[in-house]
């Protein structure tokens, strides 16, 4: 079987740089990381210098995602040999135990880290992840709220708490979490989109108007956000269909929905240009939009 470097005609430096790019941009493309990283480690480890250690960590986490315990274990052993007393490496060992569903053992490991360093936020958040994995949502919510009282600026924790509230159908609290995220990072289109989705789910005219506003803001920040585009179409359509709105509001929202529908159709046509199978996709989208169409009558 051909190696990655042979298959794609890339050098080891290009493979190393690709892994760095994925790290910096927080890509969770685990299968690709395993493919590139495993070859880089096996064939070029001696050339990587100090980069090898962060690559071991990156590949190990990806290997856990891909159920490659053999690769995760070998990366972990290299890290343990180099950093035998590192809390960061202990946390990685705990993550492997989580992947094996050995939650009690993982908790003991995280507790030992917290005993040495009570301010270790990573270990504390891993314990919350275990509660989620065990289906203990109420306990996870309580622990996250306590954590955020101390570390109010932790965006990852706010986002995780919003997801937990959504899973529990507590949309008002989920919206509050996302509002906190938008205040600290107003240019993140995903936060705007997710907030809009929560408001849309809550329903009611006021929430639908907020949903439309934030779907539009998400599109302003990233005009390729298709979820936001569909969301804008749906929220504007529902507002236009409401018997509570004035003729002007209805007219405006019919216009917004028509614009969104045109953009959706155009995006599908552009994405599948030259592909026969795309004709069916475009037709399905057009039929879906037609079935939801709001008229001026």
From Swiss-Prot:
Compartments, record wording: Endoplasmic reticulum membrane
Pfam families: TPR_EMC2 (PF22890)
Gene Ontology annotations for the cellular component aspect, listed alphabetically: cytoplasm; EMC complex; endoplasmic reticulum; endoplasmic reticulum membrane; extrinsic component of endoplasmic reticulum membrane
InterPro entries: EMC2-like, TPR-like_helical_dom_sf, TPR_EMC2, TPR_rpt
Membrane topology, from the record: Peripheral membrane protein
TPR repeat intervals: 87-120, 155-188, 192-225
PROSITE patterns, per the entry: TPR (PS50005), TPR_REGION (PS50293)
One biological process term in Gene Ontology: protein insertion into ER membrane by stop-transfer membrane-anchor sequence
SUPFAM superfamilies linked to this entry: TPR-like
Keyword Secreted included in the entry's annotation: no
Keywords: Endoplasmic reticulum, Membrane, Repeat, TPR repeat
Purpose of the protein: Part of the endoplasmic reticulum membrane protein complex (EMC) that enables the energy-independent insertion into endoplasmic reticulum membranes of newly synthesized membrane proteins. Preferentially accommodates proteins with transmembrane domains that are weakly hydrophobic or contain destabilizing features such as charged and aromatic residues. Involved in the cotranslational insertion of multi-pass membrane proteins in which stop-transfer membrane-anchor sequences become ER membrane spanning helices.
Subunit structure: Component of the ER membrane protein complex (EMC).
Family: Belongs to the EMC2 family.
Protein name stated in the entry: ER membrane protein complex subunit 2
Organism: Danio rerio (Zebrafish)
